[in-house]
Amino acid sequence: MKIRLSITIILLSYTVATVAGQQCGRQGGGRTCPGNICCSQYGYCGTTADYCSPTNNCQSNCWGSGPSGPGESASNVRATYHFYNPAQNNWDLRAVSAYCSTWDADKPYAWRSKYGWTAFCGPAGPRGQASCGKCLRVKNTRTNAAVTVRIVDQCSNGGLDLDVAMFNQIDTDGFGYQQGHLIVDYQFVDCGNELIGQPDSRNMLVSAIDRV
């Protein structure tokens, strides 16, 4: 009985060590860890905070990153800008080294170009791989100008890092440019991906701006 128990413990230890040593995420070709185990920022599977915490840039199956449908939102969030220039880069996620390119670079052109791009690290909603491809409605709290964007990258400012064109669309009074950032509200919204592939989908607006 003791021998059998010892063998079982050894096998379990070997299994845990094997899982922890597996590569995942962008380092592992987009693979996720078995058994919903977390994938760390360095591409290894594990179950501690080093692997699972969003603040440690966990890539997938992270703590607090369950499914997030339309509706999750946050207010008074910092939004900076980044020069993705997707149109000039043929809407190629790999060309701009976007984090989400591991999973989304081969999506149809109509999917990649339907909305302007943003990096996301806001206080509400999924992080890492779980956020990739999701859409946000972003509103400038100062002017109420709003735009819909798609998450293609990570950031570290605690909010959003909008493509400069999207930033400028909602910076209607120029105050954001003057101070280097905007204060925005955001809400996860349905991307309407079921429309992709229909006739004229490539002619759809890249983004919509309005005043609420």
Curated annotation (Swiss-Prot):
Domain Chitin-binding type-1: 22-64
Enzyme class: hydrolase
Disulphide-bridged cysteine pairs: 24-39, 33-45, 38-52, 58-62, 100-132, 121-155, 135-191
Coiled-coil ranges from the UniProt annotation: none
Chain ranges of the Barwin domain: 72-193
Oligomer status and interactors: CB-HEL interacts strongly with a fungal fruiting body lectin.
The protein, known as: Hevein-like preproprotein
The species this protein was found in: Arabidopsis thaliana
